Amino acid sequence: MAEHACPYWAAYFLANRLRKLLQNPHKILAPYVRPKMTVLDVGSAMGFFSLPMAEMVGPGGKVVCIDVQPGMLTVLQKRAVEAGLAARIETHVSTEDSVGLHGRDGTFDFALAFTMLHEVGSQTNFLREIYRLLKPGALFLLTEPIKHVSQAEFDRTISLAQQEGFVVTSHPLIRLSRPAVLSKPSPES
């Protein structure tokens, strides 16, 4: 587990009703997630964003959930079954160095990395891997927590993303977060 990874037990505090008031997954994701999409939730933990995305993609869509901690994914799978969304959820254990989705290049319509990038060993490698996994024209919502990541650190992360080929499309307002929406340009762009 990464040195700064959110401990398994703390994730229960992150998946609560108060957080839904401050960071409503449906409101945050509505501009980006559509029915029948294949989306990637990196650092999914127990599914605070994964389960709402599974609702949003509908029966023809898929949410691939990645986390470095198997226990998080076990709880996520249980919650997906309870919500009747298990068929739309696929889980994978990552490593500190890799998302680990080999053979899936260019298959994702959208990716989310919500307040987790500061936990990875190499941001450059992570961003390169996400770029590779996205379809041309796909969007990537990247956020970092304002209490753990300074604006200067976030700006450096965005600069790394741009060096990997991402284009910044917007900075939506998301409480308690430093957000950026990045796109993987289409060949005709």
What do the PLM-derived regions correspond to, one by one?
Residues 19-36:
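Conserved alpha-helix/loop element of class I SAM-dependent methyltransferases that forms part
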Residues 109-121:
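A short SAM/SAH-binding and catalytic strip from SAM-dependent methyltransferases
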Residues 69:
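Conserved SAM/SAH-binding beta-strand->alpha-helix loop
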Residues 137-144:
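Conserved beta-strand signature within the Rossmann-like core of class I S-adenosyl-L-methionine
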Residues 124-136:
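A short glycine-rich, Lys/Arg-flanked "PGG" loop and its adjoining helix->strand segment in the class I
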Residues 34-37, 97-110:
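A short acidic, Gly/Pro-enriched loop at the edge of an enzyme's catalytic core
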